[in-house]
């Protein structure tokens, strides 16, 4: 059995190094891919305690887990918030009675004129619709 930790910030593979350099716990698609390669199609258990992070990195991790040839078990040990909750939808879930899951609309910070704000709003709406597919697939609702 291979254990994979999704702890700390979910970050892109390209920015993972800065978190590592500062000693800040983070997970990226490249970390998950290495673990999946090492699992070689065998069952894996993903242990989650994360407040979330980068939506696109999280979606990439979700897709990697869904495409894994072996069974994927999810254990939620603490906080499972934001994009981490989407990652949790990629396998069979068990949740500690002391754990929490938090789901919310996609958010960002933006600046610019009204055109920039309208564009940002459209990007957020599309991202909301995209990630809601993971919840729908998992729950059938």
Model-derived features with residue positions:
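Terminal-region recognition feature
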Residues: 1-141
């Amino acid at each position: 059995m291979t254990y994979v930790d999704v702890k700390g910030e979910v970050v892109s593979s390209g920015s993972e190094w800065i978190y590592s350099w500062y000693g800040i716990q983070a997970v990226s698609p490249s970390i998950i891919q290495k673990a999946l390669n090492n699992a070689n199609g065998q069952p894996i258990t993903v242990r989650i305690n994360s407040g979330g992070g980068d939506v696109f990195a999280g979606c990439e991790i979700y897709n990697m887990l869904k495409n894994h040839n072996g069974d994927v078990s999810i254990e939620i040990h603490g906080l499972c918030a934001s994009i981490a909750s989407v990652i949790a939808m990629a396998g069979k879930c068990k949740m500690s009675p002391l754990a929490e899951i938090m789901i919310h609309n996609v958010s960002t910070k933006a600046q610019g004129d009204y055109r920039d704000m309208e564009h940002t709003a459209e990007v957020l709406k599309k991202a909301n619709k995209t990630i809601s597919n993971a919840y729908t697939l998992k729950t059938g609702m």
